[in-house]
Amino acid sequence: MAKRRMFSIEIMESDAFCSLPASAQSLYFHLCMNADDEGFVDKWKSILRYLGVKRGMLDFLINAGYVIVFGEDVLLIADWRRHNTIRLDRYSKSSYVHLLNTLDVLPNGRYIKAFGDFLATQDK
């Protein structure tokens, strides 16, 4: 687990992010701080508990596209690559790297769920 994380000011000071409730913003910071080197978080339930926030705050982040859900146990920070670049000599492989195959990465670095050739056909 890394001891440092970075945050993109373009995201953190955007009107969209700043319009989220303060507890949802706080939750996002804590999720990012506890993510692995690919942006996956598997202890999100514990984070909700120790922050004392309701599941609804996570739903704000999901609905706004800041977090991607994988089943009941794993979340992914959608803008992880926009926030952090991990040097190869410091990188720790994620236990969830297989889930990356279900995603596409936009030109700006944002993860989105893959829709097959949908994105490819939209660029034509």
Language-model-derived ranges and their functions:
Residues 26-27, 46, 60, 76:
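Generic detector of isolated residues embedded in canonical secondary-structure elements
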Residues 22-26, 42, 53-59:
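Short, well-structured alpha-helical interface segments that form or flank functional binding sites
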Residues 1-11, 51-124:
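Winged-helix/helix-turn-helix nucleic-acid-interaction surface
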Residues 1-38, 77:
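Short recognition helix of helix-turn-helix/winged-helix DNA-binding domains
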Residues 15, 45-46, 62-65:
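Short secondary-structure capping micro-motifs at structural edges
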Residues 35-51:
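Short acidic, hydrophobic short linear motifs in intrinsically disordered regions
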